[in-house]
A protein has these predicted regions:
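Bilobed "Venus flytrap"/periplasmic-binding protein-like clamshell domains
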Residues: 73-76, 97-113, 145-146, 165-222, ...
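Periplasmic-binding protein-like
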Residues: 162-170, 246-292, 315-317
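Acidic, polar ligand-binding/catalytic clefts
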Residues: 109, 113, 118-184, 258, ...
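Ligand-binding clefts/hinges and TM-proximal coupling segments of bilobed small-molecule sensing domains
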Residues: 42-50, 56-60, 197-214, 286-317
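Alpha-to-beta junction loops
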Residues: 117-118, 134-143, 188-189, 226-239, ...
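Extracytoplasmic small-molecule ligand-binding "clamshell" domains
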Residues: 31, 36-144
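Bacterial signal peptide processing site
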Residues: 21-24
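C-terminal motif of bacterial Sec signal peptides marking the signal peptidase cleavage site
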Residues: 15-19
Length: 317
């Protein structure tokens, strides 16, 4: 499906300028509870299986051989905007002169390469992603979306294509930089991106936290931390690693595997809230299954290796 959303051009050009950057320092992440050092970007990522012999002409959305994928293009390292085609970036169809790159783009390209489809990237606001699937504007969203029960009631989800963990990010000079559990974050001002489990489910678990209004985007969330508007933010590990790689004054707080971690009723509930999937229209199991066939060829370690590659080429934000 080929769709051009020119009506959001002005907005997304502003996003593209925010998301552009320069040289990339070596990724690193330090925290009181963990040191999250990404593996070398040359770690093993399997070649894409050649499925071009499969007849996909009857799969809803890709009858014309084009997969139209929605993402924010402002959620590094999952996706970002840059102004050139370096490192495999793909042109953003509704933002002339701008290109999308990141882990989501890499996953989307692997799926398209497998079936011989053309990849079209459309930039969209986070809150517009699911409605765009439901209206048929997008064929799929590959946008760092958690596979929550609420979301899966509205769309089909392929994957997971990444297994995330919940973390917080603060500044090295913060009084919260030595936190050993979420209880140690009591009294701090905090936020997370709107429409995410980080804001809706995680921050409310921190007793005494001064939860601020949600941020419209991941860059806005991180800006609120860097400017001192909040003491810490809640997000997932890849977003945190990407932030720390670009700003060495930030530190990751991971309580994973401890009693002081964010809690869910069951491990199954935890998984649904942190596993990342691809959304397609409800009932479009043909497209979901086609994507799952490509994703199932990779394991968690290989997904992590691909994420490391994305972080390594992420521009400064």
């Amino acid at each position: 499906m080929r769709r051009i959303l020119a009506t959001v051009l002005a907005v997304m050009m502003a996003v593209s300028l925010t998301a552009c950057g320069g040289d990339t320092p070596a990724p690193s992440a330090q925290g009181s509870s963990s040191t999250a050092e990404p593996a070398a970007p040359t770690a093993n990522v399997p070649p894409v299986e050649d499925l071009t012999g499969e007849d996909t002409s009857a799969i809803p959305g890709v009858e014309d051989g084009v997969l139209t994928v929605g993402m924010e293009c402002a959620y590094a390292p999952y996706n970002w905007t840059q102004m050139n085609a370096d490192n495999g970036a793909v042109a953003i169809s509704n933002v002339p002169g701008a290109y999308a790159n990141g882990y989501d783009v890499m996953i989307a390209q692997r799926i398209c390469d497998a079936y011989g489809w053309e990849l079209e990237i459309v930039s969209s606001a986070w809150d517009s992603l699911t409605p765009a699937i439901q209206s048929g504007t997008m064929d799929a969203n590959i946008a760092g979306q958690s596979m929550t029960a609420d979301r899966m009631a509205e769309v089909e989800m392929a994957g997971p294509y990444y297994y995330a963990t919940i973390v917080c990010v603060t500044t090295k000079d913060s009084a919260f930089a030595t936190a050993k559990s979420i209880a140690d974050l009591s009294g701090g001002k905090c936020t997370a991106q709107s429409g995410t489990i980080w804001y809706d489910s995680c921050l409310p678990q921190i007793e005494g936290a001064k939860v601020q209004p949600p941020a419209d985007s991941a860059p806005a969330m991180l800006m609120s931390l860097e400017t001192g508007t909040v003491d810490f933010v809640c997000t997932d590990m890849p977003t945190a690693m990407g932030a720390v790689a670009k700003n060495p004054d930030l530190v990751i707080l991971s309580f994973s595997g401890t009693d002081g971690d964010f809690q869910f009723a069951t491990e199954e509930e935890r998984a649904e809230n942190v596993n990342i999937g691809i959304s397609v229209a409800k009932g479009n199991t043909q497209l979901k299954d086609a994507m799952d066939r490509v994703l199932s060829a990779m394991n968690e370690e290989q997904f992590n290796a691909l994420m490391d590659q994305a972080i390594a080429v992420q521009p400064a934000i």
